[in-house]
């Protein structure tokens, strides 16, 4: 039967007629090829592709028929469809500029098959082949944004955050132009995941936390985003940014539902955390979050050591390296190195006396900090009063009169 299809195609290519008539006849041959099965179907469809890319067939007809051809292929068995997709891409390549739309469709379908097979890298690379910026066809913003996000997500699934970041950066140039709220959410999720994989934990936590307030997102997914925000905050390097994020999460009542709330509470209250208290939390982490740092310790170990060091700085005026090492459950030399790094980076106040082997902690004066906080609060209260008086001047006047009368 495949031979009959090939013969029909050869005869039709040498015949003349209107585009409409010829397209109708090619469509009948395509339907006949689709009805076949097994090896016969495969050979017939390959013959059809070869005919469509032949220069003797009008471009108007071949584009139209290849578009129809693409709509039929997802209904075929994945193994057959995959072979046909690869064959089509190979045959179209010399005339790819003439069939950009059809090639994009083929690549999207082929990527879906690879994704079902969990072959993430091949799925991503197939989509990368779509010339979104360099081709003749002008793709709309949403299509480009969705494709870049899909590529980034596939590279993340393949544990390649470097490539994922490259494509999320391309998506970031487009996301402000899109009005599709669902795509905006997908962008934020993907960007948060890229930051998470790249170990930029505090930035990832901020993105996840922002997502946890989006009402368009389902409640269970909002809680999942909040969980990721909490995990990333715990893994982040100790410092002011992390302290602010800990405060934000601790004040969020939803966090009390999360399994890691106990660790959050200890960190927010500047309590020393012991290694045996971390086992349950460590089991909740994703594989990339369990990676080791340059000194051989895990990301979690490093984060907790830094937290404990910061907590110790609020308990002691000074402490020897030996005592600090015992407190942090690490060698004295490692304790000195981490303390030195944190002081140098401005994440902890103090100085090191290497001759006596002592680290001295400095506390900031409390009064100026309180003054600034009170000043900020008064400023915000004034702003609120001004907005109330602008919105409801009559009510404000009555309230002030009542206050004066007391």
UniProtKB/Swiss-Prot annotation:
Q: Where in the cell is it found?
A: Cytoplasm; Nucleus; Cytoplasmic vesicle, Secretory vesicle, Synaptic vesicle
SMART domains tied to this protein: PINT
Q: What is its main location?
A: cytoplasm
What's in the keyword line of the UniProt record?
Acetylation, Cytoplasm, Cytoplasmic vesicle, Nucleus, Signalosome, Synapse
Q: Which residues carry this modification: N-acetylalanine?
A: 2
State the GO CC annotations.
COP9 signalosome; cytosol; synaptic vesicle
Q: Which residue range or ranges hold the PCI domain?
A: 197-366
- PROSITE patterns per record: PCI
UniProt keyword annotation of Isomerase present: no
One GO BP on record is: protein deneddylation
* Residues modified as N6-acetyllysine: 25
**Assembly behavior:** Component of the CSN complex, composed of COPS1/GPS1, COPS2, COPS3, COPS4, COPS5, COPS6, COPS7 (COPS7A or COPS7B), COPS8 and COPS9. In the complex, it probably interacts directly with COPS1, COPS2, COPS3, COPS5, COPS6, COPS7 (COPS7A or COPS7B) and COPS8. Interacts with TOR1A; the interaction is direct and associates TOR1A and SNAPIN with the CSN complex. Interacts with STON2; controls STON2 neddylation levels. Interacts with ERCC6.
Which family is this sequence assigned to?
Answer: Belongs to the CSN4 family.
Matching entries from PANTHER family are given as:
26S PROTEASOME NON-ATPASE REGULATORY SUBUNIT 12/COP9 SIGNALOSOME COMPLEX SUBUNIT 4 (PTHR10855), COP9 SIGNALOSOME COMPLEX SUBUNIT 4 (PTHR10855:SF2)
- What does this gene product do? Component of the COP9 signalosome complex (CSN), a complex involved in various cellular and developmental processes. The CSN complex is an essential regulator of the ubiquitin (Ubl) conjugation pathway by mediating the deneddylation of the cullin subunits of SCF-type E3 ligase complexes, leading to decrease the Ubl ligase activity of SCF-type complexes such as SCF, CSA or DDB2. Also involved in the deneddylation of non-cullin subunits such as STON2.
Could you tell me what this protein is called? COP9 signalosome complex subunit 4
The scientific name of the source species is: Pongo abelii
- Gene designation per UniProt: COPS4
């Amino acid at each position: 039967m495949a031979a009959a299809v090939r013969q029909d195609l050869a005869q039709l290519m040498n015949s003349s007629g209107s585009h409409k008539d010829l397209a109708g006849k090619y469509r009948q041959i395509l339907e006949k090829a689709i009805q076949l099965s097994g090896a016969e179907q495969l050979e017939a469809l390959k013959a059809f592709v070869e005919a469509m890319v032949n220069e003797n067939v009008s471009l108007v007809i071949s584009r139209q028929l290849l578009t129809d051809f693409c709509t039929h292929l997802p209904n075929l068995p994945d193994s057959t469809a995959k072979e046909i997709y690869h064959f089509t891409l190979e045959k179209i390549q010399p005339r790819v500029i003439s069939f950009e739309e059809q090639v994009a469709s083929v690549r999207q379908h082929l990527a879906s098959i690879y994704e079902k097979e969990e072959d993430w890298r091949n799925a991503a690379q197939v989509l990368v082949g779509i010339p979104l910026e360099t081709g003749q066809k002008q793709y709309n913003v949403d299509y480009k944004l969705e494709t870049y996000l899909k590529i980034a997500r596939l590279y993340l699934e393949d544990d390649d955050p470097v490539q994922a970041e490259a494509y999320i950066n391309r998506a970031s140039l487009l996301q402000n132009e899109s009005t599709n709220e669902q795509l905006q959410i997908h962008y934020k999720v993907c960007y948060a995941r890229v930051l998470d994989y790249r170990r930029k934990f505090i930035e990832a936590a901020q993105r996840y936390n922002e997502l946890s307030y989006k009402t368009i997102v389902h409640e269970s997914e909002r809680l999942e985003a909040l969980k990721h925000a909490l995990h990333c905050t715990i893994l982040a390097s100790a410092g002011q940014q992390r302290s602010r994020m800990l405060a934000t999460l601790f004040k969020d009542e939803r966090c009390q539902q999360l399994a890691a709330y106990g660790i959050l509470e200890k960190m927010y209250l500047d309590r020393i955390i012991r290694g045996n208290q971390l086992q349950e939390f460590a089991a909740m982490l994703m594989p990339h979050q369990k990676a080791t740092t340059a000194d051989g310790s895990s990301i979690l170990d490093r984060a907790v050591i830094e937290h404990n060091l910061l907590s110790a700085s609020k308990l002691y005026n000074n402490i020897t390296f030996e005592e600090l090492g015992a407190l942090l459950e690490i060698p004295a030399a490692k304790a000195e190195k981490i303390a030195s790094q944190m002081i140098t980076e401005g994440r902890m106040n103090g100085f090191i006396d290497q001759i006596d082997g002592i680290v001295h902690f400095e506390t900031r004066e409390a009064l100026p900090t309180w003054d600034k906080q009170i000043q900020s609060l008064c400023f915000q209260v004034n702003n609120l009063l001004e907005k109330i008086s602008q919105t409801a001047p009559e009510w404000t006047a009555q309230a002030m009169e009542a206050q004066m009368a007391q």
